[in-house]
Amino acid sequence: MPDRRTLLLTVLAMLAFAGNSLLCRAALKDTAIDAVSFTALRLFSGALMLAVLLHLRRRPATPARGGWRGAAALFVYAAAFSYAYVQLDAGTGALLLFGAVQVTLLLAGLLRGERLGGQALLGFLLALGGLLFLLLPGASAPPLGGALLMLLSGLAWGLYTLLGRGGGDPLAVSAGNFLRALAFAALLLLAFHGQLRLDGAGLAYALLSGALASGLGYAVWYSALPGLTAIQGASVQLSVPVLAALCGALLLGEPLAPRLPPATLAVLGGIALILAPRLGRAAREGA
């Protein structure tokens, strides 16, 4: 059982992850900021926050690390995420993102030779079916363009996660990747310089998304991870789409699409089935 400090850090990290969806959707729905400006400001403030946190740590100075492949994946994630939330509600976007990330990680495992048992295969098909159900044509389906962009964002984040495994100090790697991603953001700003829009509220949302929900949120999550098993770390992330949907309804006044609750149950239930055998093995080994 995680200690109280780990539990608190975990709750704060999940709120930060859900907060990214809420801040991005609120900015692009209710303010004048455009998706390109939001992306660039989010990456800039995230890089700044991570650099500050890296500097303040009580250990020998660690330079920012990471690499260009990780930075490219991070940029694609952030840009597609912003463009998707021009059209999607917070809960729908978070579910598509989360589902795409988990499917990407699972497929990567299969390509490495990992095998799925019967229960895990059922879970994979259930989660995939939930995503497809959400995307089926109909009055309550999310806009296809926004949905595809969010799936691309999830794919990119899954690749970013895979590239970061075994890369050393996660905070230093994240700081380096955010810093490098600014080069891609600058190119995007140049390409769309005549279409950029900004106001005070949009600026504030973008800076909060980058500095708090992204930079500080990732740092809090990295601090919580040593106190969690791998299965616990994967399982608690099941809460993010639910938190985003509930907070979107409460704070942004977004209606819950009729397909969202059953799709959420299918996706999260399927992922829980995938994790359950590993959780059982971990519990037996720790007994």
From Swiss-Prot:
Keyword Transmembrane helix: yes
Main location: membrane
Protein name (Swiss-Prot/TrEMBL): Uncharacterized protein PA1977
Stored Pfam families: EamA
Keywords recorded for this protein, A-Z: Cell membrane, Membrane, Repeat, Transmembrane, Transmembrane helix
PANTHER family reported for this sequence: AMINO-ACID METABOLITE EFFLUX PUMP-RELATED (PTHR32322:SF9), INNER MEMBRANE TRANSPORTER (PTHR32322)
Protein location: Cell membrane
One GO CC term on file: plasma membrane
Protein topology in the membrane: Multi-pass membrane protein
TM spans (from-to): 7-28, 32-54, 67-86, 91-113, 120-139, 144-163, 170-192, 202-224, 231-253, 263-280
